[in-house]
Amino acid sequence: MQHDLPGGRHDEADSSETGGAGTTENPSSEQARQIRFLEEEVALLRRKLTDSPRQNRVLEQRLAEANERVSQLTERNNKLVETLREARSQLLALREEVDRLAQPPSGYGVFIAAYDDNTVDVFTSGRKMRVAVSPTVDIQSLRRGQSVRLNEALTVVEVGGFESTGEVCTLREVLAPDTEGGSARALVAGHTDEERVVWLADPLAEQTLKPGDSLLVDPKAGYAYERVPKAEVEDLVLEEVPDVRYEDIGGLYRQIEQIRDAVELPFLHADLYTQYKLRPPKGVLLYGPPGCGKTLIAKAVANSLAKQVAAATGEKDAKSYFLNIKGPELLNKFVGETERHIRMIFQRAREKASDGTPVIVFFDEMESIFRTRGSGVSSDVETTIVPQLLSEIDGVEGLENVIVIGASNREDMIDPAILRPGRLDVKIKIERPDAEGAKDIFSKYLTPDLPIHADDLAEFGGDRQATIDAMIQHTVERMYEESEENRFLEVTYANGDKEVLYFRDFNSGAMIQNIVDRAKKAAIKSVLETNQPGLRVQHLLDAIVDEFAENEDLPNTTNPDDWARISGKKGERIVYIRTLVTGKNQESGRVIDTATNTGQYL
């Protein structure tokens, strides 16, 4: 089988014959060369295969560097874009600012009237002009007296508000419009009483105006814009409806009945007064010592009147007005100012009373401004103030539904012309409370709902009302007993007579309230110290001693007779006062200095 194998002799013979025909190269060398070539290719491929991971790493590193570079360039590009955008916006803003600064100035005017051809009348630069309106402005929204902005061509380009500054003028009369559908007009007077006619701005024309109102006026445009509150009167007048009731006042039943007859009956039963041809009183004078309830009564009258009017008319909102005049503040160093304030106060009262609402004008400390004419030491301002009040009370202009109530500690100093019948008709003396009156006043401040000490409650079987009544009884007995402890003063009259005055002679509702307040404060301190809550009788008795001790220095005056008159002691002139206080830390018999001619500062 040798002849079947490749490369055998038969093949060799064929090869020799073929080679002999044209090929002289050795076939084995060619194969060897091809084998070497293939081996080199394999080695090259092996080297490439070996070098491939390293190249991949290099390429990956270059790719990462390229990506980072791209990110940096992108971020820088974004910053440049943002910077360019900001620069562009700044350039635009600067261009707008330059354009705005380069614009000609705009003028302002006051709108007067509008017309169908899209033109309006305005008042600008002291002239009345008819100008066009920009399409961006709604001509129907313009109101008389409103400010408008004009461009360089005098075209209305913007609507403003209403003027808020100007002169304050007094309204004399509201006039009819100058033309049909035109602006309302008013006659006003300036600070020099110079009268002029002005237009009323639309917001003001919609309000109800009365003669005497203060108006804000632009004299150049000729418009009145708003009603100005009368601050000078508001400072002097407390316009309110008090919440004090007659039930809150103790010990003054007779006086309350008198003032109700004088004030409430004419308002509530005007038909009966007309039937009997009885004229209601114009004024009431409440006089008496300090702290006895004069102001409280006046407030209670206003509150009661409001309730009575509401019940009579069926209107829940019906009310009365209480004009509380701060007497000494009426005085003004400028001549005629005090009289003008009085006129304005009564004008305000007439305005409030014009619709049937009761108005009470209350003058506290009446002697300070309406004292007897000719009694002034440094000046005689009362010579004009008193006649002004008299003319307001019973002058040509009547006071309908207005009643004047005056309160004073020194009624002897008030001008007699004010006190005569027909002016302050009713004079009610508010006296110091007696023992029964003091009990009634105590009952207003000591009520069963207060904390009461357990020992005091146990004494009356836990009955709180009985305990309170007993506490009040003990306290009043201690205050009003004629004992050495209650002696206050020894006064010597001009005729040589002497009289001992007790603390009860100077008691008042204000003093009783102060005693109760002291006792309540002592009860609070007792709770903090002993942890035993409740008010006791001893607290009230100690409060009486403390109150009397504090009042020991009060009569120290260089004119004892004047002090006695203010305190309610009338009669023989007092020339000498000696204290008789024997309370704690007090020495009996201290003499009050009654020196005279001590100078104006005393």
From Swiss-Prot:
Q: Where is the composition biased (Polar residues)?
A: 23-32
Q: Which InterPro entries match?
A: AAA+_ATPase, AAA_ATPase_domain, ATPase_AAA_core, ATPase_AAA_CS, NA-bd_OB-fold, P-loop_NTPase, Prot_ATP_ID_OB_2nd, Prot_ATP_ID_OB_N
Map out region (Disordered) in residue numbers.
1-33
Look up the record and name the pathway of this protein. Answer: Protein degradation; proteasomal Pup-dependent pathway
| Any Gene Ontology biological process | modification-dependent protein catabolic process
* Region annotation Docks into pockets in the proteasome alpha-ring: where it falls in the sequence: 601-602
- Extract one GO molecular function annotation from the record: ATP hydrolysis activity
Query: What's an example GO cellular component term for this entry?
Result: proteasome complex
Start-end of Basic and acidic residues biased regions: 1-13
Q: Which residues form a coiled coil?
A: 28-103
Cross-referenced PROSITE patterns: AAA
Q: Name one Pfam family in it.
A: Prot_ATP_ID_OB_C
The record's keywords, sorted A to Z, are: ATP-binding, Chaperone, Coiled coil, Nucleotide-binding, Proteasome
| Role description | ATPase which is responsible for recognizing, binding, unfolding and translocation of pupylated proteins into the bacterial 20S proteasome core particle. May be essential for opening the gate of the 20S proteasome via an interaction with its C-terminus, thereby allowing substrate entry and access to the site of proteolysis. Thus, the C-termini of the proteasomal ATPase may function like a 'key in a lock' to induce gate opening and therefore regulate proteolysis.
Under the subunit heading, UniProt states: Homohexamer. Assembles into a hexameric ring structure that caps the 20S proteasome core. Strongly interacts with the prokaryotic ubiquitin-like protein Pup through a hydrophobic interface; the interacting region of ARC lies in its N-terminal coiled-coil domain. There is one Pup binding site per ARC hexamer ring. Upon ATP-binding, the C-terminus of ARC interacts with the alpha-rings of the proteasome core, possibly by binding to the intersubunit pockets.
Note on domains (UniProt): Consists of three main regions, an N-terminal coiled-coil domain that binds to protein Pup and functions as a docking station, an interdomain involved in ARC hexamerization, and a C-terminal ATPase domain of the AAA type.
- Protein family according to the UniProt entry: Belongs to the AAA ATPase family.
Per its UniProt record, what NCBIfam families does this chain match?
pup_AAA
Q: What is this protein called?
A: Proteasome-associated ATPase
In its UniProt entry, the species of origin is given as Saccharomonospora viridis (strain ATCC 15386 / DSM 43017 / JCM 3036 / CCUG 5913 / NBRC 12207 / NCIMB 9602 / P101)
Source species taxonomy: Bacteria, Bacillati, Actinomycetota, Actinomycetes, Pseudonocardiales
Q: Which gene name does the record give?
A: arc
